[in-house]
Amino acid sequence: MTGNELEIELKEPLLPVEEYLAAGVHIGTQQKSKDMMKFIYRVRGDGLYILDIQATDERIKTAAKFLSQYEPSKILVVTSRQYGQYPAKKFADAIGGMAVVGRFIPGMLTNQRLHGLNKYIEPDVVVVTDPIGDSQTIAEAVQVGIPIVALCDTNNMTKYVDVVIPTNNKGRKALSVIYYLLTKELLRLRGVATSLTPEDFETEL
């Protein structure tokens, strides 16, 4: 493979830009954090901050490569967001990981007394859907030294996040697309073919 061919491969998006836009992956909030400034493309007339799709695409690849270092069964995905629950569970099922959707019980990562109740889990890496909604998970992961991958919107703080995926982390279609691409890329890196589509990750209204 020549240098030019390698460059083309690295820059080839996981999804056409039009499909990212159609899913609203780039639509942020009307707030921005200092941490997320480098991922913001522009601000719209209505005050909404717009994320850089190229950065999103690159960070999905980075996150997948990072996660590929871990045993699938030791990857935990967490989401308290309603629209994140179905795609997060689908992600976990597809890669052979663990999922906690809905309420995260305090102590799940730190209190071994919950082990007898089948509530204590010991992942090697955690994926969270929203650093705000999943703040308890992040606090516990930091406490026990577990690396964190997070889907971060324009208003999120990323202080304790090891790998940031800049994205709309509230929209139904956006979350389904992100988890689909993360699944597909992670499986590809492991040499596993998949027939999954973005629609397979999309929860019903």
From Swiss-Prot:
Coiled coil: none annotated. GO terms for molecular function: structural constituent of ribosome. One of its GO terms (cellular component) is small ribosomal subunit. GO terms for biological process: translation. It comes from the Archaea. Keywords: Ribonucleoprotein, Ribosomal protein. NCBIfam families: uS2_euk_arch. Belongs to the universal ribosomal protein uS2 family. HAMAP family: Ribosomal_uS2_A. PANTHER family: 40S RIBOSOMAL PROTEIN SA (PTHR11489). This is Small ribosomal subunit protein uS2. The gene is rps2.
